[in-house]
Amino acid sequence: MTPTQLKDQSPFGATHYDIEQGKPVYYKINNLGYTMRFDGKMWYICHGAMIQNYRTL
């Protein structure tokens, strides 16, 4: 996928992404400072994840 395709397909609020098993996984920081992960349906809190380790959109 190109960066433009990744950005176009990203959910609202996503700021970072990673490729896992050939599919993009999106991340964001919520208003309390927790890293949130999007699995295609919902945002989940991702404990121990460092947002700096993921690529920016």
Model regions and ranges:
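Structural boundary micro-motifs
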Residues: M1-L57
